[in-house]
């Protein structure tokens, strides 16, 4: 019997990348997409990224791997550091798609998503929060997700880029 779950993933790409790098490895995004699909029945995986023109080949490969990319323009701050703050875009997309999925998986460690995660949890639409690393995961996020939080540190063997 085929599983009829229709789950969506909403991925804070910068938070995911930095979290995995802090563990000393790089994520294979193609393997991660397949993992989400096979293990958690994720039909649609939104990847929120700050748009940098020079990364066009990377964006194309992510789309080929099955991600729906949502771009945010980036600008250097006063220190010359480039950051694409995608938090509002991710929250908006979760709510736009709300009637179209059974459960949401939010991939981040960022406490700014506390209210979103609490809302999804309270309305039984949260599959879980997937955080790269327990030590860098916001206490607020842990509080709002309660028992519906998983950490990626132990997935290195399955998801590491080789």
Protein language model features and the residues they cover:
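Flexible, glycine-rich phosphate/dinucleotide-binding loops
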Residues: 54, 78, 113, 136, ...
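Short, structured secondary-structure boundary patches
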Residues: 84-96, 145-154
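A glycine-rich beta-strand to alpha-helix segment
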Residues: 91-136
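Domain-level signal for Mg2+-assisted phosphodiester chemistry and nucleotide/NA-binding surfaces
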Residues: 1-86, 119-122, 126, 132-133
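Short, surface-exposed amphipathic charged segments that create phosphate/polyanion-binding patches used
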Residues: 62-63, 82-90, 142-144, 161-162
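Short, well-ordered beta-strand core segments
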Residues: 68, 104, 148-149
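Acidic, PIN/NYN-like endoribonuclease modules and their adjacent C-terminal/linker elements
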Residues: 117-162
